Amino acid sequence: MADAEDIQPLVCDNGTGMVKAGFAGDDAPRAVFPSIVGRPRHTGVMVGMGQKDAYVGDEAQSKRGILTLKYPIEHGIVSNWDDMEKIWHHTFYNELRVAPEEHPILLTEAPLNPKANREKMTQIMFETFSVPAMYVAIQAVLSLYASGRTTGIVLDSGDGVSHTVPIYEGYALPHAILRLDLAGRDLTDSLMKILTERGYSFTTSAEREIVRDIKEKLAYVALDYEQELETAKSSSSVEKSYELPDGQVITIGAERFRCPEVMFQPSLIGMEAPGIHETTYNSIMKCDVDIRKDLYGNIVLSGGSTMFPGIADRMSKEITALAPSSMKIKVVAPPERKYSVWIGGSILASLSTFQQMWISRAEYEESGPAIVHRKCF
């Protein structure tokens, strides 16, 4: 009998901003690295430096000063398959150090992912990486699994896209899924703009990463935006300083909550779209009247862009204002929500009942990539 680790399924959550990968049954991903592929902007002049024509993940991040960084996943959906293949190759061989042909693999996808994309994903796994079996699961559904529920509405907001996905007894309700093309990357861009207005210049793809760090460390969601703006004007209680890589120290005040406020008021960056609270409410209203109560009572936050302090309280306040007055509203923000999609995948792939759900190599060879629509829903 082969060692259990040999046949342990792999779980790979490919986000717009970060790849989370590891082994089914683990309680956290082993590898978390940026979904970026970097190519040198200059020609190498030093022989024997071992320069590569492309760098992936952390290595691309650390050499960002001399590279052009590209994200192969935009708004949660793969747009550049060659680069995506590089990322998967890096995941298996360099990060997890496994042979993909020996492990079943569970991949994740954005809700409302185009059919052609799922097929392409399936094809690459079987043909390029020769996996023995694979499955594609919807990200938000996995987050709900991770929270120990089978019914609820998930607001999943990552780097590239936000979704509200109502799930009843384990089934996503596709007619009520809403997508909002506003997420972490837009918040970073908006913060870059705000800081530029204040005279700091952040323009390159490398400098954007600095701003992302400022956002992750210092931003928070105000319970009452207007009131918070008044407080920021009259006192320095919200000011914090941040040291840039070159030693320069910048002070940021109202920007700390102006940046994530965009999620509740997309009009702040000129987007004509409802905020995350309204999107969640609209999703619930598209569901059958009999299940709304269960959804209002199980609003689950998931993804890196729900990590801002204060977001759950604000969400609760905003939805309470929209919902019927007698409705009991509960917003759940699990502490591990940054990785809850991955954790849900880890749980799912290790269930004994899941083992008949895998798409096997034989099934793929018989039916081709379209098999994914029949087996994964």
Curated annotation (Swiss-Prot):
The keyword Acetylation does not apply. The keyword Hydrolase applies. Its EC number is 3.6.4.-. Keywords: ATP-binding, Cytoplasm, Cytoskeleton, Hydrolase, Nucleotide-binding. It comes from the Eukaryota. It is an enzyme of class 3 (hydrolase). GO terms for cellular component: cytoplasm; cytoskeleton. It is found in: Cytoplasm, Cytoskeleton. GO terms for molecular function: ATP binding; hydrolase activity. It catalyses: ATP + H2O = ADP + phosphate + H(+). There are at least eight actin genes in rice. Belongs to the actin family. Actins are highly conserved proteins that are involved in various types of cell motility and are ubiquitously expressed in all eukaryotic cells. This is Actin-2. It comes from Oryza sativa subsp. japonica (Rice). The lineage of its organism: Eukaryota, Viridiplantae, Streptophyta, Embryophyta, Tracheophyta.
